[in-house]
């Protein structure tokens, strides 16, 4: 049986489109087929968090060293702490045939598409409409009206980049969206270009006679 190299599955969407819920549902449905990327961070470990499972915990100096050496592909600063995606883990997973899920914004997604194009499968999750997105954001009751408007403006800008992704899915139902992504993942894993040893198999079992 042929084995395939791992896929780097990148999910992006505006705030309020359900990407985190979809990602968790996908990991539940495909628990033996894909793992979530483990980020490097400079923040202190919280109670119950485990090194290598939740995050890789490093100090600021080490994080900056990793960035300067190209060992961190994409990073951001949040509330004074750095978070980044380690290159080695992704490359190791690809080589081992393990697919990896990344949930990142469009800028981070574009960086991955540029640096690891042959392994990246990018999916943009859309809201059914801007009106529905407004309803969802207001329904969370976590932000005031100014923040909601800012999120909607940002969403429109993010959506304007969706055509650069491999797939666009309108998220009307979490289960259905997760199922669609599961189907995409399985199909991408089976692509001819990702089948390890295909040429050797053809030459050994199906030789062309002169």
Curated annotation (Swiss-Prot):
Highest rank taxon of the organism: Bacteria
EC number: 2.7.4.8
Entry-linked CDD domains: GMPK
GO molecular function, one term: ATP binding
Keywords linked to the UniProt accession: ATP-binding, Cytoplasm, Kinase, Nucleotide-binding, Transferase
EC top class named in words: transferase
A Gene Ontology cellular-component term: cytosol
Subcellular location per the Swiss-Prot or TrEMBL entry: Cytoplasm
Coiled coil: none
PROSITE patterns, per the entry: GUANYLATE_KINASE_1, GUANYLATE_KINASE_2
Residues holding ATP: 13-20
Occurrences of domain Guanylate kinase-like (ranges): 6-186
UniProt key word Cytoplasm: yes
Catalytic activity: GMP + ATP = GDP + ADP
NCBIfam families documented for this protein: guanyl_kin (TIGR03263)
The protein's role, per its UniProt record: Essential for recycling GMP and indirectly, cGMP.
Family: Belongs to the guanylate kinase family.
Matches recorded under HAMAP family: Guanylate_kinase
Name of protein: Guanylate kinase
Native species: Anaplasma phagocytophilum (strain HZ)
Gene name, Swiss-Prot/TrEMBL: gmk
